[in-house]
Amino acid sequence: MKQKCVLIITDGIGYNKNSKFNAFEAAKKPSYEKLFKEVPNSLLKTSGLAVGLPEGQMGNSEVGHMCIGSGRIIYQNLVRINKAIENKELEKNENLQKLLAKCKRVHIIGLYSDGGVHSMDTHFKAMLEICAKNGNEVFAHAITDGRDVSPKSGLNFIKDLKEFCENLGVHFATLCGRFYAMDRDKRWDRVKEYYECLLGKAYKVPNLLEYLQKSYDENVTDEFIKAAQNENYKGMREEDGIIFINFRNDRMKQLVEVLNSKDFKEFEREKIFENLLTMSVYDDKFKLPVLFEKEKIENTLAQVISKAGLSQLHTAETEKYAHVTFFFNGGKEELLENETRVLIPSPKVKTYDEKPQMSAFEVCDAVKKGIEKGEDFIVVNFANGDMVGHTGDFNAAIKAVEAVDTCLGEIVECAKKHDYAFIITSDHGNCEAMQDEKGNLLTNHTTFDVFVFVQAKGVSKIKDNMGLSNIAASVLKILDLEIPKEMNEALF
């Protein structure tokens, strides 16, 4: 069976039997049609317990890539935190107790929705309650979502938070859309707006809920809400404690850097803060206390390949680069021996419906070069289905699928020419459901299964009831390497 192997992850493309508002179905996709006819294929589960999330919870890119790259189901921070709240372990957390003892005033910052991709509203409320009951003066700083949940669902979430704060005697201090507060592409002007808001230098309003409604009236939805503060809020003091509620790291790193790093040079800052506590490890370089330490994940797919002395290439455009490196490698940033990484810059547009092909063709070229060079294993992510799916623009999402389809055709042809096996799958769905029955835009991920195609010597059928955690062992089987005991079985 021994062959070199390409693993292609088509981010945000899932299977939905309903063809209405389904960008995948509506797209012209000759490469996919050929794959369905000629290559063994099946469906994989990408949500809920199959990827270590609560039952019914949609999958996401971080979880999906960790599952694919580690070859096992890792119970995600979302599940770990839920359990810690239920069994009262969170309030006993040593790092939390230290912060609450040291700082009279405490600020809680995070994405406030039930999307479950970056955070959970229940975690935010649990933390407010713990801090308030401890006797600290508490300030809530809500970031509105509109991306992992529907674009105007913020009104109900923020109404809920406002009432919760009033009942607890907590200050509801600021409001801002994730477009600004949670940028991850070094657009520092956006983060600066939020930083100034936290310092009490933003647009002042008497009622943040009314401000949100007013934004809707001006056609500004949750993701893009401009930073505003309650008129009574006077800003953070340097001695205050700051707790970050998001358990996913990639969209909080820049904000933490702005608030805490002594070496930050992107813009002038009036204050730097020392008393920070993050829900999970955002970046090892921060040296900050955390509530939930990283679980050690050993014997990942990339590690096994590296230890065997084989070469590997990991490539994607900026938006998904962390997923094929950090997350795919089990939450480890460092480069392995014989591992090459190629980062293709994502286009500098406000939202990706403006350029639905994104940088797919450049990513495709990097893969073909890797095949021609003879890399033993290549993993690539095409971001289009997900990133364009998030915009809610149906026609742009169709173009996104078509761009991916073109790239698949080229890579498959190149793989066959050089006798490479290939596996094509997705980390989760998105663009296959762009509106609900009522015509509301759906910008979030789905809980649908995803396709998997396996072209390799000796493979004619894929087992039933498989998931993303079965892919790593499949790659090792193709490469003729031993499958470690930590991994789930192969797809075939």
Swiss-Prot record:
Transmembrane segments: none annotated. It catalyses: (2R)-2-phosphoglycerate = (2R)-3-phosphoglycerate. Mn(2+) 1 binds at residues 386, 390, 445. It comes from the Bacteria. Pathway: Carbohydrate degradation; glycolysis; pyruvate from D-glyceraldehyde 3-phosphate: step 3/5. GO terms for molecular function: manganese ion binding; phosphoglycerate mutase activity. Its EC number is 5.4.2.12. Substrate binds at residues 118, 147-148, 178, 184, 248-251, 320. Signal peptide: none annotated. One of its GO terms (cellular component) is cytosol. Mn(2+) 2 binds at residues 11, 61, 427-428. Its cofactor is Mn(2+). Keywords: Glycolysis, Isomerase, Manganese, Metal-binding. HAMAP family: GpmI. Belongs to the BPG-independent phosphoglycerate mutase family. This is 2,3-bisphosphoglycerate-independent phosphoglycerate mutase. It comes from Campylobacter jejuni subsp. jejuni serotype O:6 (strain 81116 / NCTC 11828). The gene is gpmI.
